[in-house]
């Protein structure tokens, strides 16, 4: 029987850290050590360029003028849009206006389904890649897409796998290069939560009180003991209101933005935090930039990741307040044991799906290497298949 190791599952609160080094938001990670993780993929000449091109103040790069064409499905006013705008402003502010971005908001150039092909083909220079719809191509990104422990922990987890660990980063970045891509950072994605129409006090009463759990990802929640009804996010408000489902789980931010607090009174964070939306650049475009320009773009991506972490920590607090004011109930706080059980379900379900995705393409062994590191980083005692 697989068991969780002891996790230090402390919610990362308001942090005054420099940058998140991993994949959670649109930059590198939040700690000083992880802040350079995205930059770790840059060549040694890129690293030296960073010091040689910065001004005496250390934050202005002497670069020839250049432009990046950026496509995003986010609107400028959304959290994701604010993160991208930070990247744009950083480039301009740290190049005396010589680095500019031609930004296309709201999927006007490429929608979610098209943005991978768009950046891979060079139709656009950069995207904030929502990788989940593209796992059939980017197989090695199918590892569990969130982690326990808070915003910073999720970023550190993604950064370790994508940038810092020599074995896993070689697999993930190598696959990106095969598709003419380079990942620059990871962007924070916020907390995940349960909501229900019935009262519960812990994981046991959450599961036992449910007659119909609405979600598209049945494997995780069936592992926990729920009876799952397939319901998409766009239909969940109505399903909760009409009693077709009595409970669900998703990212806290979209749950609140879609108003589920109006039809579900009882809420709890599930202890996991998301990351992703890697700032991804066309590899040919990256190679066409000078070492100085590359150093600036990487620094902007690193700084943006840090910014995204703080933005999402603040957003989590604000969303919790919104829900509690609307429902009149405080969030249930799960015990460490409950959070361990939830993470076990997530890891087992996602690991099985990841291996099934990779095996037909001859990538099973590589994915097992990634999953072993993912388990190590999150403190989960995982036994790989056939071991």
Predicted regions and their residues:
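Short, solvent-exposed loop/beta-turn-alpha elements that line the ligand-binding surface or hinge
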Residues: 151-178, 355-359
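Short, low-complexity disordered leader/linker segments with a strong preference
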Residues: 1-67, 381-387
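N-terminal secretory/targeting leader peptides
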Residues: 24-30, 54-156, 182-387
């Amino acid at each position: 029987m697989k068991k969780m190791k002891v996790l230090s599952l402390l919610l990362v609160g308001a942090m005054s850290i420099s940058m998140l080094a991993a994949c959670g938001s649109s930059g590198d990670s939040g700690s000083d050590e992880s802040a350079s993780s995205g930059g770790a993929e840059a060549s040694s000449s890129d690293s030296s360029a960073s010091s040689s091109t910065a001004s005496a103040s250390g934050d202005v790069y002497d670069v020839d003028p250049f432009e990046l064409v950026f496509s995003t499905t986010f609107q400028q006013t959304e959290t994701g849009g604010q993160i991208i705008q930070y990247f744009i402003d950083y480039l301009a502010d740290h190049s005396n206006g010589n680095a500019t971005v031609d930004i296309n908001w709201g999927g006007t150039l490429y929608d979610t389904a098209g943005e991978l092909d768009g950046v891979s083909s060079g139709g656009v220079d950069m995207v904030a890649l929502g990788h989940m719809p593209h796992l059939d191509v980017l197989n090695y990104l199918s590892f569990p897409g969130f982690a326990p422990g808070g915003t910073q922990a999720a970023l550190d987890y993604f950064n370790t796998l994508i940038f810092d660990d020599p074995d896993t980063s070689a697999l993930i970045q190598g696959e990106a290069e095969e598709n003419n891509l380079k990942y620059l950072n990871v962007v924070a994605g916020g907390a995940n939560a349960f909501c229900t129409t019935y009262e519960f006090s812990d994981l046991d009463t959450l599961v036992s009180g449910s007659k119909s759990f609405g979600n598209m990802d049945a494997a995780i929640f069936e592992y926990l003991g729920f009876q799952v009804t397939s319901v998409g996010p766009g239909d969940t408000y109505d399903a909760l209101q009409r009693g077709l489902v009595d409970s669900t789980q998703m990212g806290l931010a979209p749950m609140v933005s879609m108003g589920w607090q109006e039809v579900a009174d009882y809420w709890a964070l599930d202890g996991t935090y998301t990351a992703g939306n890697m700032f991804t650049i066309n590899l040919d475009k990256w190679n066409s930039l000078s070492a100085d320009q590359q150093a600036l773009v990487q620094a902007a991506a690193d700084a943006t990741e840090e910014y995204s972490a703080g933005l999402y920590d603040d957003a989590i607090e604000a969303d919790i307040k919104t829900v509690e004011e609307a429902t009149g109930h405080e969030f249930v706080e799960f015990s460490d044991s409950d959070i361990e059980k939830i993470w076990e379900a997530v890891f087992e379900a996602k690991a099985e799906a990841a291996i099934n995705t990779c095996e037909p393409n001859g990538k099973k062994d590589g994915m097992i290497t990634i999953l072993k590191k993912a388990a190590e980083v999150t403190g989960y005692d995982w036994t790989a298949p056939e071991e």
